[in-house]
Amino acid sequence: RPFHWFSWYKKIKLRRFKNCRPKSIYEKQLINDGIVVIPNFLPSQEFIKLKEEYNQIILNSQKLKIIEKGSVKIEIHPMTNKESKKFPMMENFSKNKELIRLISVGEGINPVEQIKNFDLENSSFGDPQDDSDQNVQFHCDVHFDSHKILYYISDVSEEDAPFIYCKKSHKNNFQRMWYELKRGQLEDSHKDSYRIENHLDKKFFANYFKKITEHKHRVIAPENTLIIANVHGFHKRGEASKDKKGSIIRIPYRYNPLGPSKSIPADLYNGNLF
């Protein structure tokens, strides 16, 4: 319900005020726009060494997880705190103070000493017509503030499936609450496959979609670019041309006021509760 949702929103703001207030330009930008993009995040020599470690880990990985979504193939190596100790640059990255502060400000939590887990991720793209990844349509991950951190290990052009975000769409204003109320009346609102673009035949959703996409930001950027986005806002994975490849470090990070999502039925967690 919008009332409970707004109550959580106030708690997040109070938690942020208490634990980690925004100070830097980037931290304030993350709160205001819902996304911050930082080029040349690491010094060039440090990034070169990190990329060498990245390639070495992927090449020798014994625990590579492979996900296929039609013509898209994603190879994921999960990095743990224990494993990162064997790789100095990965260890430094997991302890990067600027990165940790940005996450802490966004989530409203006390800064930690080290990020415990993150993923090394290689993507290969086939025929766009056979791409079955649902995330090529705009969506929001959850009903409360949570963050997605993407660190480009390779250059990302228009054809390399760039991350796309609608700035300020994370804000819990009246328009967003009204959208959630209207969305909750749709038959598919509780499904993971729900996408606003499937309902543009309805005037309200068409108008709302037009409004949020006026501030669409396509993150086309070189390697060594850091992206942190509040995925309560609308975002998507851009389309990729055939035979394109990409490499990133991904850190999903979310504070969940409902507790672990696995303990809650999927339909309730995703929509019906609201």
Language model features with spans:
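Short, conserved beta-strand element in jelly-roll/cupin
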Residues: D141-E158, I220-A221, P252-Y255
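Active-site region of the double-stranded beta-helix
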Residues: V112, H139-V142, I153-P162, K168-H170
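Short, charged/polar surface micro-motifs in flexible loops or helix N-caps
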Residues: L99, I109, D127-P128, H143, ...
